[in-house]
UniProtKB/Swiss-Prot annotation:
GO terms for molecular function: 3'-tRNA processing endoribonuclease activity; ribonuclease P activity; tRNA binding. This is Ribonuclease P protein component. One of its GO terms (cellular component) is ribonuclease P complex. Belongs to the RnpA family. Keywords: Endonuclease, Hydrolase, Nuclease, RNA-binding, tRNA processing. SUPFAM superfamilies: Ribosomal protein S5 domain 2-like (SSF54211). GO terms for biological process: tRNA 5'-leader removal. It catalyses: Endonucleolytic cleavage of RNA, removing 5'-extranucleotides from tRNA precursor. The keyword Aminoacyl-tRNA synthetase does not apply. The keyword S-adenosyl-L-methionine does not apply. RNaseP catalyzes the removal of the 5'-leader sequence from pre-tRNA to produce the mature 5'-terminus. It can also cleave other RNA substrates such as 4.5S RNA. The protein component plays an auxiliary but essential role in vivo by binding to the 5'-leader sequence and broadening the substrate specificity of the ribozyme. Consists of a catalytic RNA component (M1 or rnpB) and a protein subunit. Its EC number is 3.1.26.5. It comes from Lactiplantibacillus plantarum (strain ATCC BAA-793 / NCIMB 8826 / WCFS1).
Amino acid sequence: MRKSYRVKKETEFQQVFETRNSYANRQFVIYVLEKPGQPHFRVGISVGKKIGNAVARNWVKRRIRQSITELKPQLKQDADFLVIARPTVAGKSQAETKAYLSHALKLAHLLDND
C-alpha cells in the first residue's frame, strides 16, 4: 500500500477520532471520516501493546495491510478511516483476519457488496 493511502500524522488521526463515528466487532474498531472529493481512501492502523510484543504487533499490522490491499477495489474511495486492532485478533490466520476486517468494514458502510 502506497504512502498516499495512509493516514500518518497525529493531527490526521485526531481529525478522524473527533468525528466519533465508529463501528466495531470483536476484533476491530473502525473510525470513519467522510471526505467528499478525495481521490482515494486513506487508512491508519493502530495496534496496542495488549496484543503482544513488537513482533506480534507488526505481524498483525502486516496482515491488516494485506487484507486492505486485497479489498481495495471494493472500498469506498472518499473517506479516511482508522483500523484499531483488539487483542482477540492476535494469532489469527490471514484468511480469518481478512474475514473479520471485511465484516467490520461492512458495518462501517465502507465496503461495497458487489
